[in-house]
């Protein structure tokens, strides 16, 4: 009896080892995000990088705090105009970016392929209403992919040395907004009624996408504005131009448009003019373990559109908090960390 247990014990051991390896893979198999890592624990300090605007910085600090709460050393790098490029160049390990921008950048990597290859990546990118970094600088027109299709294409890419983690149920997708007074006065609630009114309306659009978006307005909606006012990056990240009636319609992002205090009306149907921008983390897999993947996915899973709106308001409102403080307070309110900073 005892003699027979040796081989059985060996088989059991091998089976458990195989099961352990499978579990290490499955631990990161969140919906739409499969990540293979060779280790359970992260072995080095991770560097996170985000764009320069306050909301991006607050989001980065929230992920950093989640990693720290899991016992992982992590720090924020200086803000970057092209955070995705910083990760791909090896100067950072993490960024949370819009899904279309990620798809456009990652689809160009050698060996990357999705359901339709690199062409699908290119077709999924279009105008970001506030910035124009190199990840999508070559995307001149909106693609044919909606938000769900973009995420599927993104998570289907085969990446070496990098991984796309779980997308949040929150977007920074572009949209068009107007004041409630303008909406009521012109009976304007969706893009189908925009064309005859455009010659009377001034649009505010960030400089980086002004040419492209103006062309899309004409091509898709037969909209030819009275004037297109070019907004600087700082102006475009807020909604003061439309609130102050400097312009009647402004291109902004969903987390800006939904703040109740601003009493803005989102023009329905405007999504056809902008690339989907679901918040999606990109990580380097070098020295990154399942502990980091789990911590990052935990935050992404909890992040909903209302949460992004609240975080944005905390970081950019009238009594704005510094991004690290906004992130810490938001995480505490959501009970996502065991040791609030």
Predicted regions, residues:
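C-terminal motif of bacterial Sec signal peptides marking the signal peptidase cleavage site
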Residues: 24-28
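Short helices/loops that flank or line small-molecule/ion binding pockets
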Residues: 61-69, 81-95, 215-222, 232-250
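A conserved helix-loop-strand patch within extracytoplasmic ligand-binding domains
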Residues: 132, 136-205, 301-305
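A bilobed periplasmic-binding-protein/Venus flytrap-type ligand-binding module shared by bacterial periplasmic
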Residues: 171-184, 276-290
């Amino acid at each position: 009896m005892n003699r027979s247990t040796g081989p059985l014990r060996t088989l059991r051991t091998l089976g458990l080892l195989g099961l352990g390896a499978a579990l290490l893979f499955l631990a990161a198999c969140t919906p739409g995000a499969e990540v293979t890592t060779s280790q359970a624990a992260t072995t080095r300090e991770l560097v996170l990088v985000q764009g320069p605007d306050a909301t991006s910085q607050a989001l980065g600090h929230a992920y950093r705090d989640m990693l720290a709460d899991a016992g992982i050393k992590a720090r924020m790098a200086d803000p970057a105009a092209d955070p995705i490029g910083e990760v791909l160049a090896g100067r950072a390990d993490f960024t949370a970016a819009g899904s279309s921008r990620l798809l456009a950048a990652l689809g160009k990597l050698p060996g990357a392929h999705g359901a339709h290859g690199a062409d699908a990546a290119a077709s999924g990118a279009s105008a970001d209403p506030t910035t124009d970094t190199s990840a999508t600088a070559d995307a001149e027109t909106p693609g044919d992919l909606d938000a769900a299709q973009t995420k599927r294409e993104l998570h289907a890419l085969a990446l070496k040395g990098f991984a796309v983690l779980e997308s949040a149920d929150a977007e920074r997708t572009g949209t068009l907004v107007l004041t409630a007074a303008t909406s009521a006065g012109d009976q304007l609630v969706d893009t189908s009624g925009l064309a005859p009114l455009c010659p009377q309306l001034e649009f505010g659009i960030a400089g980086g996408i002004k040419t492209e978006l103006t062309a899309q307005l004409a091509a898709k909606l037969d909209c030819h504005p009275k004037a297109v006012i070019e907004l600087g990056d700082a102006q475009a990240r807020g909604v003061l131009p439309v609130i102050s009636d400097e312009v009647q319609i402004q291109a902004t992002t969903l987390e800006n448009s939904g703040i109740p205090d601003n009493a803005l009306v989102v023009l329905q149907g405007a999504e056809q003019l902008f690339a989907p921008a679901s918040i999606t983390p990109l990580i380097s897999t070098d020295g990154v373990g399942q502990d980091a993947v789990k911590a990052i996915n935990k935050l992404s899973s909890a992040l909903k559109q209302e949460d992004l709106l609240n975080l944005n308001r905390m970081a950019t409102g009238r009594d704005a908090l510094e991004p690290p403080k906004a992130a810490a307070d938001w995480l505490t309110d959501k009970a996502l960390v065991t040791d609030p900073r």
